[in-house]
Amino acid sequence: MDPLKLENYLTFRAIIRGSTLSPGFFRRWCFPALADVVGNIVVQEEGRFWQILPENHAFWGLLRRGFTVASFTEIITAAQLENERLSRQLAFLAFISFLLRNWPSDSLVPEADRLDLVCAPAWSRMQIWTQTARLINDLQDSVLEEQGSAEEEECEEALLAGDSDDPLFG
């Protein structure tokens, strides 16, 4: 169950990469369609993202000094991004793009490495959400099947026993 159709890491990476670019022809036609959607969400939600992670937050200092893996895992886990308009996954993609767009320019991390340093833990988080949703769906389906088969058995027993309320079968 993957409503965003993120089949693999390369697709995910291309969407994040495209969403960091300015709106226009290049982003719209050279990257997956979701990149343009995510890029537009970043623009719309930028104020809210700055409230979640203000400019004076210690996270930006960690990025500046090159500490990325532990800090990303902490931010990704702690941030409550979804709201009534955005699903958790879309808000998450937009937040990742926001982080890349606002990465401190004086960071020790080379610009070429930033995308993968952000996308790898983000992709792992997305996979966990997808697998969890799939497990919940499978569990709900099996519960519904069990309830349905139990009701069918009760109906069969009632018909065989002749104690049905239906006048034709009574």
Curated annotation (Swiss-Prot):
GO term, biological process aspect, one: symbiont-mediated suppression of host apoptosis
Keywords (A to Z) from UniProt: Early protein, Host-virus interaction, Inhibition of host apoptosis by viral BCL2-like protein, Modulation of host cell apoptosis by virus
TM ranges: none
Keyword check for Translocase: no
Pfam families: Adeno_E1B_19K
InterPro entries (UniProt xref): Adenovir_t-Ag_E1B_19kDa, Bcl2-like
Family statement drawn from the similarity comment of this UniProt entry: Belongs to the adenoviridae E1B 19 kDa protein family.
Name this protein carries in UniProt: E1B protein, small T-antigen
Phylogenetic classification of the source organism: Viruses, Varidnaviria, Bamfordvirae, Preplasmiviricota, Tectiliviricetes
